[in-house]
Regions:
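Conserved positions in beta-strands of structured domains
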Residues: 14, 27-30, 97, 111-113, ...
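Catalytic strand-loop segment that frames the active site of acyl-thioester-processing enzymes
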Residues: 21-56
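Hydrophobic beta-strand-centered segment that forms part of the acyl-chain substrate-binding groove
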Residues: 4-7, 70-107
Length: 133
């Protein structure tokens, strides 16, 4: 994944995703190139999904979901259309090699595999310092 310049952060992200604090699990959006988008998250000790200073699996899943939502939100924002709500249909073949600690900077790539009507199949890679989590 190539590091990109941040194009959206802070309160600007609320234009892309429906979540609000304390449920916000992205704090940077880097944009879209072809069928891949990038987002980021600074893991903080007070994160809703942190336990004993470690981001739990559910937090990683929610981060991926919001990263995918930010991609869709960005596309709709560029079209000047209302951002739609989305839902996770299922999670399959997910492998987590390690959980990130508070202080970690996550960099996530969302790649579109297939889109049929309003259903989107994605793959995701979440990294910390170029190490796949």
């Amino acid at each position: 994944m190539n590091r990109k310049e941040i194009i959206c952060r802070g309160d600007e992200l609320f234009r892309l995703i429906p979540q609000r604090p304390p449920m916000v699990m992205i704090d940077r959006f880097y944009g879209i190139e072809e069928n891949t988008s990038w987002s980021g998250l600074a893991v903080t000790p007070d994160n809703l999904f942190c336990r004993d200073g470690v981001l739990q699996e559910t937090g990683i899943i929610e981060h991926i979901a919001q990263s995918a939502a930010a991609r869709v939100g960005y596309i709709y924002m560029l079209r000047e259309e209302p951002v739609p709500l989305g839902f996770i249909g299922s999670v399959e073949k997910m492998k987590i090699f390690r959980l990130p600690s508070a202080g970690a900077e996550l960099y996530t790539g969302i790649t579109i595999v297939q889109e049929v009507f309003d259903i989107t199949l994605i793959t995701a890679e979440v990294k910390e310092n170029d190490e796949l989590l």
